[in-house]
Amino acid sequence: MLRKRVEIGPVESGLWNAVETDGAAHLTLIDPASQDPERAVQMARSAADAGTTALMVGGSVGATGSALDRTVRAIKDSVDLPVILFPSSAAGLCDNADAVFFMSLLNSRSTSYLIENQALGAPIVSRYGIEAIPMGYIVVEPGGTVGWVGDAKLVPRRKPDIAAAYALAGRYLGMRLIYLEAGSGAESPVPTSMVSAVRDAIGDTLLVVGGGIRDAEAARKLVSAGADLIVTGTGVEESGDVFRFVKDIVTAIHV
């Protein structure tokens, strides 16, 4: 008897559709620990108006509990875009999001970030009925807070083959998205040579790139190198005009 194939949920399908339609897509990352829900809603509205495809909510430190729940709830009540959780641990889950990037930090030295938090979180995700999107997460130098918190063996910036090997392992493990992360607030993004190497290794798996993306030109170069989804968080928070910042990136990456 043939077993039923795994079905892709509506949020993940929406990401695929956006990439297929426009060549690439933008995701806005909002950290509940960085601002109150009211400010988060303002950022989300501006990003939505500018053409971001979905809103990620999470962070390396403090994105848990009531701050997370209130932020997700406020955004859901105000913005008609999918809200995807971006948890650093099982504590970064709540029941009012649309989906979760269910990820393993592939180059972590700690089993906590490779599989233990995932085992703790899986029953919660199932009980909440949140769409789980399987993702391999790879942290590249300098790594920022997430590299330290996640005890990552950082991929050297001049070693694209190492990133490609981790990414290919993620693909073979069944992860449908691979995320290259330079770290929140990094001075520069993941090198384009590394993005290209990973793109070649993982075929049609969705490739996400985040960290250190501070302007539209940087985003455009990453997409030209092979990125499908561009994530900005710190850049959005620090921009004086969220709409303009996101709009410039969205315009630059659409082909």
Curated annotation (Swiss-Prot):
One of its GO terms (biological process) is glycerophospholipid biosynthetic process. Sn-glycerol 1-phosphate binds at residues 179-185, 211-212, 233-234. It is found in: Cytoplasm. Mg(2+) binds at residues 31, 60. Pathway: Membrane lipid metabolism; glycerophospholipid metabolism. GO terms for cellular component: cytoplasm. It catalyses: sn-glycerol 1-phosphate + (2E,6E,10E)-geranylgeranyl diphosphate = sn-3-O-(geranylgeranyl)glycerol 1-phosphate + diphosphate. InterPro entries: GGGP/HepGP_synthase_I, GGGP/HepGP_synthase_sf, GGGP_HepGP_synthase, GGGP_synth. It holds the Pfam family PcrB. Its EC number is 2.5.1.41. It comes from the Archaea. It is an enzyme of class 2 (transferase). CDD domains: PcrB_like. Belongs to the GGGP/HepGP synthase family. Group II subfamily. Prenyltransferase that catalyzes the transfer of the geranylgeranyl moiety of geranylgeranyl diphosphate (GGPP) to the C3 hydroxyl of sn-glycerol-1-phosphate (G1P). This reaction is the first ether-bond-formation step in the biosynthesis of archaeal membrane lipids. This is Geranylgeranylglyceryl phosphate synthase. It comes from Methanothrix thermoacetophila (strain DSM 6194 / JCM 14653 / NBRC 101360 / PT) (Methanosaeta thermophila). The lineage of its organism: Archaea, Methanobacteriati, Methanobacteriota, Stenosarchaea group, Methanomicrobia.
